[in-house]
């Protein structure tokens, strides 16, 4: 049952846009919580149940506790809570998988399941690439990803993150695994399909990371006498095929030639985002700005070269330092170090000695080697992207970590702990707490999300929208986004000239202020409050709210535009023109509304030539 729940959670997360949307992640969270409940039952019903608790478990538990403490101190509680729930979901998945799925057969099942699923998604990605389809399961994924394979993910880079973890596992088993000929052929085709899918993502970071993982696997196998020729042949084949495809495919050549993502002089590029993340960490070196607070605080740190609002730093290491500080990063780093030490020790133990007369194959060795190299590839990709913050990829990585840690029992018996007193009650309390939090949150945020999405689908400013958003607010009054949308609904109704528009504007102003209190780093509630007051002629009262928006977003082109709009409403077109020009300068292509208003001002100031 636990294996089915874990497989369902992993598979659904991969298929459902990587689990990035709240409505899909809640299902994943519920499945993981249910698996913890089943484990809790097993702890008390299986008489000889033992707990597998190697040293890395203490580091995992310590970081989970640290995340709880930091969440209680966070400036934006709702955002921090959502991040905490993700961390607790991964923590639960790790402990459940480690203590219930440590058999070799379960590792083989999950390997085939994930590799098979990724292979099917590569065919879907090939369709996206060949037809220039820009949708995922019928939903638009954005113009920037046209003619790139992303499978069931929105971003091709994150699909590459999944593939780079699984290709080394499949390749190691094909070359050196103890497997029947038919299975070797099928898995070989899967490996080739995933390699093709990785190429079609056009993710340069994915190519480098995937190549790194494959290189580690094949070099490790080439050092083993029994696998040397097969590994060297694989290296030669991959180099020949890869070079031929790259030289004959224009889209691959074009992607290699375009490198603006790392150009420090270009706008909206990774170096610009990394600079902001670095400064954020320097200002909060020990504790960071808070769980998942990078996006909330980014506007204060960006330069006029960056008009985008990235959710993450496009570098998991900088993102971790910015969010968690040195203390949190040290806990995460300790976890990875303990895992690496244990994994390498296990690898040495499960490796078979070279045979004198025949090749000795080992499924344990190939899985451990492939999974280690796949995780190394993911860590390499983390220097230029945020795959560890994509739930599906994070969960696959956690599952591999748990399975590898479970294989440590082949290296030592030190990790086993009897489930007698006091361990059984203690671990039961931990599992009960994790399962209880996840199941409660699934129900609680499930209700909120249902009402909120209903409000999003309704017509702007309609009674239906306001009723749905109020219902969501009643369930969860900490969500600044709900308050923001309620304010916007009342503002739209007021600006439509509805009866009592002044009271509606004041109602909107009140909701915007609630949103600003819940998330003081978002400029939108501030300048929307000012717009409501401008609408009813209270220009002097509106000015402080635009100042507040500018304080939290000093280089934002949308904020600059709204300040210009305020000056225009106040009867100062000269000041408005200055802010519209500033807005235009803060982004490329220039902000279209600012250009429109600037043309209107210049047209009105130009005297009629007459004839």
Language-model-detected regions and their locations in the chain:
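Transmembrane signal-anchor hairpin modules in multi-pass inner-membrane enzymes, especially those
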Residues: 1-88, 92-116, 172-188, 215-239, ...
């Amino acid at each position: 049952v636990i294996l089915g729940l874990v497989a369902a959670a992993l598979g659904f997360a991969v298929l459902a846009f990587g689990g990035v949307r709240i409505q899909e992640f809640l299902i994943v969270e519920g499945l993981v919580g249910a698996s913890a409940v089943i484990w809790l039952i097993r702890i008390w019903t299986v008489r000889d149940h033992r707990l597998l608790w190697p040293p890395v478990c203490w580091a995992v538990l310590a970081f989970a506790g640290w995340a709880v403490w930091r969440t209680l101190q966070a400036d934006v509680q709702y955002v921090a809570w959502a991040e905490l729930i993700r961390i607790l979901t991964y923590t639960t998945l790790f402990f459940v998988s480690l203590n219930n799925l440590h058999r070799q057969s379960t590792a083989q099942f999950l390997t085939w399941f994930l590799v098979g699923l990724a292979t099917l998604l590569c065919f879907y990605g090939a369709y996206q690439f060949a037809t220039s389809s820009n949708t995922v399961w019928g939903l638009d994924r954005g113009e920037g990803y046209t003619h790139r394979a992303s499978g069931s993910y929105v971003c091709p880079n994150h699909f590459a993150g999944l593939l780079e973890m699984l290709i080394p596992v499949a390749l190691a088993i094909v070359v050196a695994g103890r497997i029947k000929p038919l299975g070797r052929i099928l898995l070989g085709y899967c490996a080739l399909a995933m390699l093709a899918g990785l190429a079609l993502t056009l993710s340069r970071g994915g190519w480098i990371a995937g190549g790194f993982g494959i290189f580690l696997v094949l070099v490790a196998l080439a050092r083993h006498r029994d696998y040397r020729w097969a590994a060297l042949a694989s290296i030669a084949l991959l180099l020949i095929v890869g070079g031929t495809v790259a030289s004959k495919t224009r889209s691959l050549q074009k992607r290699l030639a375009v490198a603006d993502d790392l150009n420090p002089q270009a706008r909206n590029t990774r170096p610009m985002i990394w600079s902001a993340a670095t400064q954020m960490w320097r200002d909060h070196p020990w504790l960071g700005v808070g769980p998942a607070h990078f996006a909330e605080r980014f506007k204060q740190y960006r330069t006029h070269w960056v008009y985008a609002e990235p959710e993450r730093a496009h570098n998991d290491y900088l993102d971790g330092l910015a969010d968690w500080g040195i203390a949190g990063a040290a806990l995460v780093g300790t976890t990875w170090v303990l895992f690496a030490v244990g994994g390498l020790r296990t690898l040495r133990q499960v490796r078979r000695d070279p045979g004198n007369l025949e090749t000795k194959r080992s499924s344990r060795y190939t899985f451990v080697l492939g999974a280690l190299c796949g995780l190394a590839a993911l860590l390499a990709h983390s220097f230029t992207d945020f795959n560890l913050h994509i739930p599906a990829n994070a969960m696959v990585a956690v599952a591999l970590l748990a399975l590898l840690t479970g294989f440590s029992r082949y290296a030592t018996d030190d990790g086993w702990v009897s489930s007698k007193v006091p361990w059984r009650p203690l671990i039961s309390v931990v599992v009960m707490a994790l399962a209880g939090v996840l199941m409660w949150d699934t129900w609680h945020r499930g209700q909120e999300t249902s009402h909120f999405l209903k409000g999003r689908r309704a017509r702007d400013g309609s009674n239906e929208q306001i009723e749905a958003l109020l219902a969501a607010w009643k369930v969860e009054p900490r969500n600044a986004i709900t308050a923001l949308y309620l304010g916007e609904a009342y503002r739209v109704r007021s600006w439509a000239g509805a009866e009592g528009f002044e009271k509606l504007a004041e109602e909107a102003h009140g909701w915007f202020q609630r949103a600003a209190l819940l998330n003081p780093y978002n400029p939108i509630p501030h300048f929307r409050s000012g717009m409501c007051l401008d609408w009813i002629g209270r220009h002097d009262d509106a000015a402080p709210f635009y100042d507040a928006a500018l304080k939290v977003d000093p280089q934002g082109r949308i904020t600059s535009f709204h300040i210009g709009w305020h000056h225009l409403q106040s009867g100062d077109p000269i000041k408005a023109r200055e802010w519209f020009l500033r807005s235009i300068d803060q982004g490329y292509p220039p902000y279209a509304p600012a250009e429109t208003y600037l043309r209107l001002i210049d047209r009105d100031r130009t005297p009629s030539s007459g004839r």
